[in-house]
Curated annotation (Swiss-Prot):
Disulfide bonds: none annotated. Keywords: Coiled coil. Residues 178-261 form a coiled coil. This is Putative MSV199 domain-containing protein 468L. The keyword Membrane does not apply. Pfam families: DUF3627, MSV199.
Amino acid sequence: MEMATKKCNIFGVDSIGEPEGVVKKALDESLSLLDIFKFIEITNFDLDPIMTNWFWQVMVNNHSTHLGRVVLEWFGYEGEDSNQKQKFIDMLKRNKIPYKQLKHTDNEIELYPSIKEEMTLLPHKGAIASSKWLVMEPFNIKMAMLRLNTKNADIIKRYYIKMEELIRLYAQYTTLFQKREKETMSREMLDLRLMMEDMKITNHRQENMLIESHNMLRSMGVEIKDIRHENNDLLDQNNELLERVDDVLQKVNTVQKKLDISVEDRAPQPDKNTRRERFLLLKRNNDTFPYYTIRAQEINARKALKRQRNMYTDVTVLLDIVCHPNTKTFYVRIKDDLKSKGVEFNLCEINISNSNIDEAILVKEMMKINDKKRDV
């Protein structure tokens, strides 16, 4: 019988099976990723608190570390400071483990605050001049710890093994945390995509129904201004809602990329051109409101322009501003500026017959407002 093999990461962590008890406790504790020290606190992981921080720095740093009296005592060396250090150095020499001793004249001492602190405790300059401070690379410290033959040797080695166990558990925790984040993100993206598809279908049906209704009324010789205004307003609201959903979907995709999560069945990235904002000013053969504005993303702007040309026999584009960062805010500024000149606004429609400007000035004023975005 062949043994079943489990797919694990480089730490031997299985992301498919059930998490271990302490890992499950950490996952249930917070929706945010815990750092390793918070993980130790939450799981009550058994570690010697005296040397945890120092030993962790040795494991993760890639520069030399100062081994002073506190460290040597923790290693199990007894007696005067000089005797402790000499016994430790003798052990290093026997096992051919590299080390370095710094003098007070070495510029490298500036890298070790603990050495500078010890220097301030020495009684006089002569003591400082005769002193040396022991520093070692992280790899060599680990080698030395495994060679210890002091009263604390077994404690040190057990501590080393516990640290390896901690790394393994924390690796399992981070693996399962990212797996959970990926699943949550996938569900949210699927819900958004389904909602967007439903809205697109509904919007398409409404557009077809409105066009059919308008064509039927025109064939009957009926002109219902209020219905037309309501229909245009409804279509604009639908388009704006679709654009907001599209923006949310893009933000979800951006978050997922930052998590470095690969999801096979995800919503496609939106086409850059179709997301560009357009502002159009139209002139139609409408006696009451001859001017009409379209404010939407590229794809929705094209649809709105097509609707206007289906509704009127004479439609001219007087102004077409592409890639405006916010056409909604732009239109608000236009209304604020031109209402003072007597221009009448009704949703997207404009009437200048009772104002003190003509068509040329209307276009010029809108261009002037648009150009203000460059005045930074």
